[in-house]
């Protein structure tokens, strides 16, 4: 199967569908690449853990925008987090990329767990917010030959509200990815 950049139509699906289907896909950012191993969905204004729960603001405007765009924000005064906008324009939803297996030459097969670590190592910052990742080859997510059948859903991590939702998607055994 050729590896192609995921198109806007991929991100127009429900956030829960996208969060599961992103597992095993390849995140490309400048000279870095990694296989996505963990995601979390944040859906609409009724999701108390979503930034969009407080409505439309300058910060959340990207979440209300076109699917397939990056939503990068700063937390705890020290970390950036990378999300991809999902569903339909006007409905605020995004999927947080929480972990990857790094495939870059200088750190091959390194497990990066945590969205802050991911952005720090890949050097993703606020300047990469609101980028169309369906068009740029140096910042995109591509299809792979990896088929992820066995993932688990758990409660989301690091939130104080909406903990009852099992909207975190994770590959429990990364052993097979360490030889990709």
From Swiss-Prot:
Keyword entries, A-Z: DNA damage, DNA repair, Hydrolase
CDD domains (UniProt xref): AAG
GO MF terms, alphabetically ordered: alkylbase DNA N-glycosylase activity; DNA binding
Entries under Pfam families matching the protein: Pur_DNA_glyco (PF02245)
Domain of life of the native organism: Bacteria
Enzyme Commission identifier(s): 3.2.2.-
GO biological process: base-excision repair
Family: Belongs to the DNA glycosylase MPG family.
NCBIfam families: 3mg, PRK00802.1-4
Full protein name: Putative 3-methyladenine DNA glycosylase
Origin species: Ehrlichia chaffeensis (strain ATCC CRL-10679 / Arkansas)
């Amino acid at each position: 199967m050729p590896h192609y950049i995921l198109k806007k139509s991929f991100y127009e699906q429900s956030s829960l569908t996208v969060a599961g289907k992103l597992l095993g896909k390849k995140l490309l950012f400048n000279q870095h690449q990694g296989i996505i191993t963990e995601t979390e969905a944040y859906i609409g204004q009724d999701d108390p853990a979503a930034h969009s729960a407080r409505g439309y603001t300058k910060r959340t405007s990207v979440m209300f925008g076109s699917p397939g765009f990056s939503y990068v924000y700063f937390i705890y005064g020290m970390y950036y987090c990378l999300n991809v906008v999902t569903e339909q324009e006007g409905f605020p939803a995004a999927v947080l990329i929480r972990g990857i297996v790094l495939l870059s030459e200088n750190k091959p097969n390194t497990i990066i767990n945590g969205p802050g670590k991911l952005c720090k190592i890949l050097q993703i910052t606020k300047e990469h917010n609101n980028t169309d990742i369906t068009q740029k080859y140096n910042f995109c997510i591509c299809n792979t030959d990896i088929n992820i059948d066995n993932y688990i859903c758990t409660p989301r991590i690091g939130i104080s509200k909406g903990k009852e939702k099992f909207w975190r998607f994770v590959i429990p055994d990364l052993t097979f990815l360490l030889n990709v």
